[in-house]
């Protein structure tokens, strides 16, 4: 089986990661103790991707949980699915990273990293044919960002040919947790460009907007945000967990979505958007789902796809529906909005259908887009970074942990390069190539 090893780090990573497991257990009919409640072949057919079968028929998530302080771990353990994880797979320190990337990457995190790698190795040895890793973390804090990227680079060294997928929560302009977020995010981004294969970009501001605007929640909690994220994560991974026709593993996903190796930051969207505990009264049609999921208001990160162009995209539908109708709708979107797709990658939207809908819905769709407009996020973080880095504000917290200013400068220029690469492909037209097909296509 093509197993995926799940790793969650830091407070944010552990919270969205645990929520993800609640959703996945539910979809595969596994109760909080790891016992199977369902007799359905579809649910159990590819159960080994995320679960290891232990003695007595218990299914244990292939999950590694790490943090530099015990708090979040304790709440995961006492949470609804706390008993399902392997107790040895909780690895935590006592000191915390104090929102300092350098503590996570160089000092506190570096002391704990070997024990994390031991558990990762043990889990990897349990796999027949490991296809890759997925990491949940945020980029604004210290542990998920600093130690998360340290772990990613160590795994990259040890398993160079396995896929590395991340669910990365970027800091948001309006919803700020700490003042040094731009530093932490830029230092992490620098690492993710080099060491990750595919990054699903999430951010709290976009999630808050969805809660306010679409779900009409007046005071959304992190629980509501995590509900949205876990729905999206479940949608992104459903083609890996259930039998399906298209995008059935992490590598196929990457091949379909990544035209240039550095441009692997994806926007994700989900439809229909529902709030926690609500009942869906009306089944949406395939055209409605398609329209909703391409809507810029449905994107889980604060960048507007209308400000850029799609290099590639992938749409995953779930539920009983006709694949022909799905293909027609996707084609329809491309024809109607052709200026938002680069014309030099023909047929750049892939669609897939998985028969099992998520709990409580009869159909749903998940969207993954590689859009040049994601540069808005990097540009925003980089402006905040530069504003603080010029006067060297807060820098002593990082140099005090042994970091060099040079590393800041390198990270800054790597992120600026990334932004200009996105811009370059956004502006590129088919004309610039030296081919002549007799007709001469028109650029914009």
UniProtKB/Swiss-Prot annotation:
SUPFAM superfamilies: Tubulin C-terminal domain-like (SSF55307), Tubulin nucleotide-binding domain-like (SSF52490). Gene3D superfamilies: Helix hairpin bin, Tubulin/FtsZ, C-terminal domain, Tubulin/FtsZ, GTPase domain. SMART domains: Tubulin, Tubulin_C. Tubulin is the major constituent of microtubules, a cylinder consisting of laterally associated linear protofilaments composed of alpha- and beta-tubulin heterodimers. Microtubules grow by the addition of GTP-tubulin dimers to the microtubule end, where a stabilizing cap forms. Below the cap, tubulin dimers are in GDP-bound state, owing to GTPase activity of alpha-tubulin. Residues 422-444 are annotated as: Disordered. Belongs to the tubulin family. GTP binds at residues 11, 69, 138, 142-144, 204, 226. It is found in: Cytoplasm, Cytoskeleton. Mg(2+) binds at residue 69. Residues 429-444 have a biased composition (Acidic residues). Dimer of alpha and beta chains. A typical microtubule is a hollow water-filled tube with an outer diameter of 25 nm and an inner diameter of 15 nM. Alpha-beta heterodimers associate head-to-tail to form protofilaments running lengthwise along the microtubule wall with the beta-tubulin subunit facing the microtubule plus end conferring a structural polarity. Microtubules usually have 13 protofilaments but different protofilament numbers can be found in some organisms and specialized cells. GO terms for biological process: microtubule-based process. This is Tubulin beta-2 chain. Its cofactor is Mg(2+).
